[in-house]
UniProtKB/Swiss-Prot annotation:
Gene: EFHC2
Tissue: Expressed in trachea multiciliated cells.
InterPro entries from the UniProt entry: DM10_dom, EF-hand-dom_pair, EFHC1/EFHC2/EFHB
Name of this protein: EF-hand domain-containing family member C2
One Gene Ontology term, aspect cellular component: sperm flagellum
Record organism: Bos taurus (Bovine)
Length: 733
């Protein structure tokens, strides 16, 4: 009842075309065993490896049982011994039930040792030779037969004990391996023997392999100032841990007058008590060779004897790593060398090996002598001051080397000019020169200044270059002197400053946009352009906060919460009583300014474009649209703005660069794409005329032309004064 398996096993088959019984180990119907049948296990049952369980070769990977065993090996035809006890290690690999027997190496045994039985599955002794050893056949204090040899297992390791206990094997108490009687007798004889030739080994291979390329480094000094023409010599001592040798190098200062030697002391063992004198060959050796030998051949002498009593041997002590420490004075062939400091590796070595924690260094350098200031003759007046100085340094005059790094860093490239431009007026008592306007340019690459006067018609002045590009000295300095003159620096230029340029006094009234932005970005060099410092200065006038709000409110008649720049500057200057400069007022105004439209309205641009197209009688818009359709491969009716600009230039569209760029930016979408049909339809002045608008022509002029005959332009138009009052005084509306 309840059976679901009824198949019958195949018991008969063919082997080499011969009918024979092949199902001795197969069960009967439904997997049940036949009467009297016992299935012989092929492998250990731990683990079973059925279903989702891990197989044995995965679960027991790299897990080995280790047993200690011995074997009584009979020794025939020998009177000294009848048998010999041979020890073995039996390894049972759990992953595949293989066994390996290994015999440990015994010195001077005369037996072939090592692997006694290679790793494989070993069958049980007869009559069960058709089965193999499994983990359940091993235990302590039992006999195991491998190929007719009986191994007596007397112990195992801790892992084997724990494993056998976990799988349910009851371990027997461990036994002891009997001592080999012959080895015992031989050991007793060796202990009482005194060899004629001493067996002393001087093995330095371990030290070499452990400390190769590891060197202790000490910084030391040899004070030889007591001798004639002697002085303090700085040295570096290298102690090689691989062979206990010492090497010393000398650190020669610049222009010391001494010959540059590669080594102060060649690498060798350094004796403690030196110089010890001159010894004969063979006196300082590890072993003494007696003057007897058994013969010689063409290659070597053989049959020599060593003196085991070491009579007459000279012992010489050498410096070791334990003798070296900071503050110790060592003897280097009669020279007293003081160890002053060491490197980090040396400190770690002594801290790890000897537990030393005190590594206080000793100053090894002598106090530097007072520096003699070199005096140069005064400036002669010929050439520049740098050229005169270079002619005094050496016999062969060399040109002055400019600061090339600064030149590369601040040279103009692209749209970045690295030039600070200020607009100034001449401070003079002459009425004709009061209204003259100048442009002062400061070049950051070489700290030079140029002054330009814009050309104004009917002014009586030719204009043009007022001062060519040159470095400008500060006034009040002596001309013929040995020191370099001081020149005007960029930090001294700001709006509201007075600059003396070769006797002409200029008042800086304004600066261009690039200069103001540069000064605000580098507020550490230009503190007057730092909004934080200016706000902090305004907070000191907190007592005038109410008055300041009343003045701004009175100036804002339309209640727009903003005032123009001239009104703002006048209010700030009057209330702070001259504590703020024009540069600081501009910094505040630029921070709280009302944003302006970056470009004119699109209709204004289209009207100006129509005016230029009419003057040039350009009407070829259909051809432009056809070219755009040809370029539009995907038929989306949009093209990138750069492609439309290229087509306009190839068709000679009579619009200047600035106006065309502004038109394209006004028609492009967020992806920089332009609908070319709507763009050229808007430019078609025949089909879509636009009324003429009275606006200023959208042409970017040079700053010199824009300033010609005009007062100083304002940096911003309107300022939000309420935002300023909130940030400075916390005043609400």
């Amino acid at each position: 009842m309840g059976k679901e398996k009824f198949h019958k096993s195949q018991h008969w088959g063919f082997c080499n075309n011969v009918r024979m019984l092949v199902g001795e180990d197969k069960p009967g119907i439904g997997g049940e065993l036949l009467f009297g049948q016992k299935i012989k296990p092929k492998y250990s049952v731990f683990p079973k490896g059925m279903g989702t369980d891990s197989p044995s070769w995965v679960a027991f990977d790299k897990q080995v049982l280790s047993f200690d065993a011995y074997l009584e090996d009979e020794v025939p035809d020998k009177s000294q011994e009848n048998y010999r006890i041979r020890r073995y290690k039996i390894y049972f690999y759990l992953e595949d039930d293989t066994v390996e027997v290994n015999e440990p190496v015994l010195q001077n045994s005369g037996l072939p040792q090592g692997i006694f039985i290679r790793r494989h599955r070993i069958s049980l002794p007869p009559p069960n030779e058709d089965q193999f050893y499994t983990v359940h056949h091993f235990n302590v204090n039992t006999d195991i037969v491998f190929y007719g040899r009986t191994f007596k297992v007397y112990d195992c390791d801790a892992f084997t004990k724990n494993f056998l206990t976990k799988i349910g094997v009851k371990l027997n108490p461990p036994g002891q391996c009997p001592e080999d009687p012959y080895m015992k007798t031989r050991r007793e004889k060796l202990d009482c023997m005194e060899p004629i030739c001493p067996y002393e080994s001087f093995d330095t291979l371990k030290q070499f392999l452990e400390y190769d390329r590891k060197v202790l480094r000490f910084f030391c000094v040899w004070d030889d100032s007591g001798s004639v023409f002697g002085d303090r010599r700085e040295l570096i001592l290298h102690y090689f841990l691989s062979d206990d040798t010492i090497e010393i190098k000398e650190v020669l200062p610049h222009n010391s007058g001494r010959d540059a030697m590669s080594l102060f002391l060649q690498r060798r063992k350094l004796p403690k008590y030196g110089p010890p004198g001159v010894y004969q060959p063979g006196q300082l050796t590890d072993q003494t060779v007696l003057n007897v030998y058994g013969g010689y051949s063409e290659t070597r002498v053989y049959g020599f004897l060593l003196d085991k009593y070491q009579l007459g041997k000279l012992d010489q002590e050498f410096y070791k790593d334990t003798d070296l420490s900071i503050g110790t004075t060592i003897n280097v062939w009669g020279r007293k060398v003081l160890l002053c400091d060491c490197d980090d590796f040396t400190k770690t070595y002594y801290r790890t090996k000897y537990g030393i924690e005190n590594f206080t260094s000793i100053p090894c350098k002598a106090p530097s002598p007072p520096k003699i200031e070199r005096k140069f003759p005064p400036y002669t007046g010929f050439g520049s001051e740098e050229d005169s100085l270079r002619s005094c340094i050496g016999l062969m005059p060399t040109p002055h080397q400019r600061n090339f790094k600064k030149f590369i860093e601040f040279d103009s490239y692209g749209n970045i000019s690295n030039t600070l431009r200020f607009f100034a007026k001449l401070i003079t008592h002459k009425c004709a020169d009061v209204e003259r306007m100048f442009v002062i340019s400061y070049f950051l690459s070489d700290d030079t200044i140029s002054v330009f006067e814009p050309i104004e018609r009917n002014s009586g002045y030719t204009g043009g270059m007022f001062l060519k590009r040159v470095r400008v000295k500060k006034p009040g300095q002596e001309v013929f002197k040995s020191e370099f003159s001081e020149y005007i620096k960029a930090e001294e230029l700001y709006v509201g400053a007075k600059v003396n340029v070769n006797g002409y006094l200029f008042f800086l009234v304004n600066a261009d946009e690039y200069t103001l932005n540069y000064m605000e970005r580098n507020s550490d060099k230009f503190p007057l352009s730092s909004i934080e410092l200016v706000i902090q200065k305004l907070k000191e006038e907190e007592c005038k906060s109410r008055e300041l709000k009343q003045v701004f409110t009175a100036a804002d008649c339309m209640h727009t919460k903003m005032v123009d720049f001239n009104t703002f500057r006048e209010i700030m200057m009057n209330l702070t009583v001259g504590k703020l400069t024009d540069q600081e007022v501009i910094t505040i105004a630029r921070r709280y300014r009302v944003p302006e439209d970056p470009c004119p309205h699109r209709n204004v641009l289209v009207a100006q474009a129509h005016e230029q197209l009419k003057k040039n009688a350009f009407e070829n818009f259909e051809r432009l649209i056809a070219m755009c359709v040809y370029e539009d491969r995907e038929k989306k009716k949009v093209l990138p703005s750069k492609d439309i600009k290229r087509l306009c230039k190839s068709s000679r569209l009579p619009l200047n660069e600035d106006l065309l760029g502004s038109l394209l930016s006004g028609f492009e979408d967020s992806e920089k794409q332009i609908n070319y049909e709507s763009f050229f339809c808007a430019l078609n002045w025949r089909v879509n005329p636009v009324p003429v608008l009275e606006v200023a022509s959208y042409i970017k002029e040079r700053c010199e032309d824009e300033w010609l005959g005009m007062p100083s332009p304002i940096p911003v138009k309107y300022i939000y004064y309420l935002n300023l009052l909130k940030d400075v005084f916390g005043v609400d509306e």
